[in-house]
Amino acid sequence: VTQRQYQKIAVIGAGLSGICTAYFLAQAGCQVTLIERHGNVAEQASLGNSGLIAAAGQMPTAAPGLRKKILSSLFNADSPILLSPTLSPALWGWLRKWMAQSQLERYRLNKTRMTQAALYGQQLLLQLQQQHMIDYQASAGVVQIFRTEAQLAAATKLRAILVDLNIAHSLLDAKQVRHLEPNLNSTTALAGGWHFPQDGAGNCLFFIKQMKAIVQAMGVQFQFMQTVTALQSGEQGAILTIDGEPHVFDAVVVAAGAGSNKLLKPLGIRIPTTIANSYAAVATIKNPEFAPRGAVLDAHYKTAIVRIDERIRITGMIDLQPGRRARAMHPQAMTTLLKIADDWYPDAANYNQASFWSGNVAMLPDGPPLIGATPTPNVFVHIDGSSDGWAGTVGAAAALADLIGGRQPEIDVSGLQLTRYH
């Protein structure tokens, strides 16, 4: 594959994956058309991103102990996983794949793959910030907190992974955690935590909107309110049916998140995603002296509490209940997100006036982003397998642009491609 073969490229989806892929393709000299069925960038999963720019703090959802969490989710009202006792055969099959990835060795491998993509993404974000004067309200440092000694002990067993990956981290007791985050509620049980000084957080939506202007200046064409209904591949390249009309490109990148499989399945391309609902709450800070200093991860609930400018963003929950595919906020999710914020920062914000977001996300069973070629010529993918951070998505986009252009990526992409499932 040479870059010359793929000069005119369509990218489907104007979320974080799509717009970053478009940027790096345009930077390499490609003519890029970004096609989006909504009226603007970041209208779906990217809108609900946690804001974490994390390499150390981003963990695969398939972690040791997942099977127990799935079982307990059927009986606990405030479980981070929302699951119905009645499962479809397809969802049950996906859950089995998800649980298989929670074995320690698989977790170690997936964590390594996610970390290398995120570390690369962090470097690229700094370059983009300097080159284009992007301001995405960045903050430094992430603290992961554990409510019980058992949770802390379980996490400590995984410390070797952090050491092997040469990730800067500190194991903290409760007093040290409160020194870093002095506004944590003193009445909520706290056993200890991890501090990841090189991780951080930022406003993903701000970043995407600024990237939109940047790629437009680079010549990327946007087609909003346009729906791709079919994909084909032939000798002339990739043929996209857009609102009933055929359009020919040298290649296409499917970066449509939860809508990707619908386009890929007719080509016989099988990607092991399931569609989940993800949730976020945003509350305006009323008492800055009681607010988080930076980004906090509640290990028990797999939930991020992130201060971005004058707001607190609480994101988490994995809703795998059938029938909850529309943008409907689950009452249980609303209650749990606000409970977590109130547990740790009760006086920081007007939680009773919080705004909520709910949207579909594509979940991969293992966690690392999925990029690269497919068995169908001229058809590439970029699917973010996790919604709890965005550094890895940026790194994966740059690596994908290199693959499409016939260049050697800066990171090992063997574990980020479709072949990892075969």
Language model feature labels by segment:
Residues 8-34:
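N-terminal Rossmann-like FAD-binding beta1-loop-alpha1 element of flavoenzymes
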Residues 153-165, 188-238:
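Helical element adjacent to the flavin cofactor pocket in flavoenzyme catalytic cores
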Residues 27-47:
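Glycine-rich FAD pyrophosphate-binding loop
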Residues 49-52, 57, 61-100, 230-238, ...:
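Active-site substrate-recognition segment that forms the wall
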Residues 48-174:
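Dinucleotide-binding Rossmann-like beta1-alpha1 core, especially the glycine-rich loop
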Residues 58, 199, 302, 320-322, ...:
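Glycine-rich phosphate/pyrophosphate-binding beta-alpha loops
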Residues 109-119, 144-154, 194-213, 326-333, ...:
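Short beta-strand to alpha-helix junction loop
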Residues 169, 342-422:
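C-terminal catalytic lobe of FAD-dependent flavoproteins
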